Swiss-Prot record:
The keyword Iron does not apply. The chain crosses the membrane at residues 22-42, 57-77, 100-120. Keywords: Cell inner membrane, Cell membrane, Membrane, Transmembrane, Transmembrane helix. InterPro entries: Fumarate_red_D (IPR003418), SQR/QFR_C/D (IPR034804). The lineage of its organism: Bacteria, Pseudomonadati, Pseudomonadota, Gammaproteobacteria, Alteromonadales. GO terms for biological process: fumarate metabolic process. SUPFAM superfamilies: Fumarate reductase respiratory complex transmembrane subunits. It comes from Shewanella sp. (strain W3-18-1). This is Fumarate reductase subunit D.
Length: 121
């Protein structure tokens, strides 16, 4: 029998943010840490002298600001989704309070990162 009025769920939103955060954390974050944290400050390429003013200019640019916000917020959404489901796997059932506490923490990081980047520009 076909159910013509299926139950609505907010789970696809959280799974979408979880997936985006996981991909970002696996593909983009290691390259960012390698370049911005190790190679460029140590003059690994010998062509770019990176300093505070250049990083500030990058983050102040709209594309750099968006990159910074995504680098901070998407992995946080991924982590909080893992925490939420990890608590469930450990038989710690907090219900919707735990669910929204985890996602509220990720939303708070997103808002704070956005405000920080906007204040820089």
């Amino acid at each position: 029998m076909i159910n013509y009025s299926p139950k609505r769920s907010d789970e696809p939103i959280w799974w979408g943010l979880f997936g985006a955060g996981g991909v970002w954390f696996a593909m983009i974050t290691p390259v960012t840490v390698l370049l911005m944290g190790i190679l460029l400050p140590l003059h690994g390429f010998g062509v770019v002298d990176i300093g505070y003013d250049k990083v500030y200019a990058f983050v102040s640019h709209p594309i750099g600001g968006a990159f910074t916000v995504l680098s901070l917020s998407l992995p946080m959404w991924h982590a909080m989704h893992r925490v939420h489901h990890g608590l469930h796997d450990l038989q710690i059932h907090l219900g919707t309070v735990g669910k929204y506490a985890c996602y509220l923490a990720a939303a708070l990081v997103t808002v704070l990162a956005t405000v920080w980047v906007i204040q820089l520009s």
